[in-house]
């Protein structure tokens, strides 16, 4: 898949411009890159930005300031393929049913690797747990890799 043109990147960037001033919040650097098709970790975003933006309102960035960060992220080896996630979660599927306990998956998201907040984990797990408290991890991985859909419930 060809990378998006600069015009398309600008359109994506503008979708995140909440104050309509031609800028995004520094905390959105990774979100905009992900909306443009990249899959950077938070560590990669911090490295590309040269700093970590922890608080909303701390710094606002123009498209011209964001674009080099995006370009650096685009050069990085793509992180976390479907096969990587599948093999990682399969380890927890003791009965080889294609499912793991939702509580165990939540614990994994909160405690291992690049840890999520409780709210982030809950958002990812929304709608994937079956009536028995299990998650079909193949469907979960596909949902995660499909990208962020911030306004979709």
Curated annotation (Swiss-Prot):
Cross-referenced PANTHER family: MYOSIN LIGHT CHAIN 1, 3, MYOSIN LIGHT CHAIN ALKALI
Repeat as UniProt keyword: yes
Signal sequence annotation: none
Organism of derivation: Caenorhabditis elegans
Cellular component, GO annotation: muscle myosin complex; striated muscle myosin thick filament
InterPro entries the UniProt entry points to: CALM/Myosin/TropC-like, EF-hand-dom_pair, EF_hand_dom
Entry keyword set: Motor protein, Myosin, Repeat
UniProt GO molecular function: calcium ion binding
Classification via PROSITE patterns: EF_HAND_2
The name this protein goes by in its record: Myosin, essential light chain
Description of how the protein assembles with itself and partners: Myosin is a hexamer of 2 heavy chains and 4 light chains (two regulatory light chains and two essential light chains).
């Amino acid at each position: 898949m060809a990378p998006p043109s600069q015009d398309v990147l600008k359109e994506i960037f503008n979708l995140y411009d909440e104050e309509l001033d031609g800028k995004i919040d520094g905390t959105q650097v990774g979100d905009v890159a992900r909306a443009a098709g990249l899959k950077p970790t938070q560590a990669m975003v911090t490295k590309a930005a040269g700093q970590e933006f922890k608080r909303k309102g701390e710094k606002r960035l123009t498209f011209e300031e964001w674009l080099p960060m995006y370009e650096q992220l685009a050069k990085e080896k793509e992180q976390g393929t479907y096969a990587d996630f599948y093999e990682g979660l399969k380890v927890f599927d003791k009965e080889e049913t294609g499912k793991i306990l939702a509580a165990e998956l939540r614990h994994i998201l909160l405690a291992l690797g690049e840890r999520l907040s409780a709210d982030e984990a809950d958002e990812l797990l929304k709608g994937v747990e079956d009536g028995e408290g299990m998650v079909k991890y193949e469907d979960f991985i596909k949902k995660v890799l499909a990208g962020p859909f911030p306004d979709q419930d």
